[in-house]
């Protein structure tokens, strides 16, 4: 009977856990819809701004703005974007390990490679392994463009002060509920891509002037790229957590089925034993 009670207690415990994982899945699904809408809205704006900036930058000298000047690379900063919370599968661990791979592969290229971590999980993983220059935590629950602009301003200020010569960001880009792609991008210095063949010969008129627009667009471009990275990470986090909680719920259901089968067999064996004892007692009385 003691064994039956322990099995029944475990079944109740797993059922309670399944209720929690199902609830977390539903919450993540609701948050994912909103986060996905934000990502879908931000991508065209970020893409078009980058396109305009690239066209403009191609017509200027590489030193037209301090943010475009490519210096002798001595120091680099890697911005690592993870989440503040867990229970989202390998979302944080995979990205933190990818950041560490980048550090190990590129550390020979720099005299110093430091980190800025956004999200508690990445900070906890990397703080004892590498130099964390700055940490931003607890920003995702109230994430806004203003927050991203403040972080971008820190990056630009440090770059202009020559605290670092290159800035990279690594984050999970949202592809689908099941898929998040670890993405590494260079934020600073801003570089213009090679002109597309279908744009050759096209002339654009810029007002008030190319230099003035460049000075205005470059900081805005950094802000938008940081904001997009954060939005992508938030959507990816909710997708990963939704998938993880769905898997946990299915595993719990499977475990409940197995435990129920074990319980029924144990109960049947206990009843059979009791019947045999009753029959044996009855036979001994008759004898």
Curated annotation (Swiss-Prot):
UniProt entry tagged with the keyword Membrane: yes
Domain of life of the native organism: Bacteria
Cited Pfam families: ATP-synt (PF00231)
Similarity comment text for this entry: Belongs to the ATPase gamma chain family.
Quaternary structure and interacting proteins, as annotated: F-type ATPases have 2 components, CF(1) - the catalytic core - and CF(0) - the membrane proton channel. CF(1) has five subunits: alpha(3), beta(3), gamma(1), delta(1), epsilon(1). CF(0) has three main subunits: a, b and c.
Job of this protein: Produces ATP from ADP in the presence of a proton gradient across the membrane. The gamma chain is believed to be important in regulating ATPase activity and the flow of protons through the CF(0) complex.
GO biological process: proton motive force-driven plasma membrane ATP synthesis
Subcellular location per the Swiss-Prot or TrEMBL entry: Cell inner membrane
Signal peptide feature range: none
Protein name, per record: ATP synthase gamma chain
Membrane topology reported for the UniProt record: Peripheral membrane protein
Example GO molecular function: proton-transporting ATP synthase activity, rotational mechanism
Cellular component terms (Gene Ontology): plasma membrane; proton-transporting ATP synthase complex
Transmembrane segments: none
Keywords on record: ATP synthesis, Cell inner membrane, Cell membrane, CF(1), Hydrogen ion transport, Ion transport, Membrane, Transport
């Amino acid at each position: 009977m003691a064994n039956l009670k322990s099995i029944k207690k475990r079944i109740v415990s797993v059922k309670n856990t399944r209720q929690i994982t199902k609830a977390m899945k539903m919450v993540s699904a609701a948050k994912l819809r909103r986060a996905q809408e934000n990502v879908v809205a931000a991508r065209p704006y970020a893409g078009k701004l980058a396109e305009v900036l690239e066209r403009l930058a191609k017509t200027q000298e590489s030193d037209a703005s301090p943010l475009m000047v490519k210096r002798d690379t001595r120091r680099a900063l890697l911005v690592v974007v993870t989440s503040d919370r867990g229970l989202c599968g390998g979302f944080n661990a995979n990205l933190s390990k990818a950041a560490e791979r980048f550090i190990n592969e590129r550390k020979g290229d720099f005299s110093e490679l430091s980190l800025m971590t956004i999200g508690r999980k990445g900070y906890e993983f990397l703080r004892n392994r590498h130099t964390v220059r700055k940490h931003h935590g607890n920003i995702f629950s109230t994430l806004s463009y203003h927050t991203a602009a403040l972080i971008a301003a820190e990056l630009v200020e440090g770059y202009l002060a020559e605290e670092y010569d290159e800035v990279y960001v690594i984050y999970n880009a949202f592809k689908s509920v099941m898929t998040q792609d670890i993405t590494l991008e260079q934020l600073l210095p801003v570089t213009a891509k090679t002109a597309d063949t279908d744009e050759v010969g096209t002339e654009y008129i810029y007002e008030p002037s190319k230099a003035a627009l460049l000075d205005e667009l470059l900081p805005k471009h950094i802000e938008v790229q940081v904001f997009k990275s954060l939005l992508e990470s938030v959507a990816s986090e909710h997708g990963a957590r939704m998938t993880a909680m769905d898997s946990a719920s299915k595993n719990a259901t499977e475990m409940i089925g197995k435990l129920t089968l074990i319980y029924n067999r144990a109960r049947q064996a206990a009843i059979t034993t009791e019947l045999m004892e009753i029959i044996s007692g009855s036979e001994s009385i008759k004898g």
